[in-house]
Amino acid sequence: MYTNLTASSLLDLTVMQSEFEFKNWNHTIRFPVDGFALNATSRNDAANERIGKQQPNNRDMLYKLLTVYQPFNQVSNKANGGTIGNFETLHDGLHNSFGLGHMGIVEVSAFDPVFWFHHANMDRIFALYQYRYPDTWVEDAAQAKGTFSVARGAIEGPASPLAPFHMNALGDMWTSTTSRNWTSFGYTY
């Protein structure tokens, strides 16, 4: 059972993720008692309880993010020292509420329909921030962590490619600049 994870057990958990039984589950699992069990079942009530307990903090953080100005590079992620929270913390908190199920593991989270509702809501929140503060945007910054396409320490900015997201059949990548206007995607809120 993995309900009270410690810092050291999180490292062990990261190593063991490849052993989860996703390939044997024929449906989405949320917050199972045991993510390694062939017959794991969702504990939706427990996940809902966890989300409910986070709501006051999430609501307060979101209110501050939308009413107290911070430059985009601070409000968008954890790496740049924002003082009132950031969108990444709001985003990650909901994924983590689902524990060892599909939403808790990056490689398979998009298989859970909740993922799509969650990300649509994060897009909406981001659009509200853009509407409120239209003059702040992505700035060049050294990357604190590397990814499969960006080296740690690389300088990334508004014109950097957002791999692996292709914007056309020629292989051109979306950038923060080309994706800045969310209405170009046909969205309305």
Predicted regions located by residue number:
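C-terminal accessory segments of proteins
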Residues: 1-189
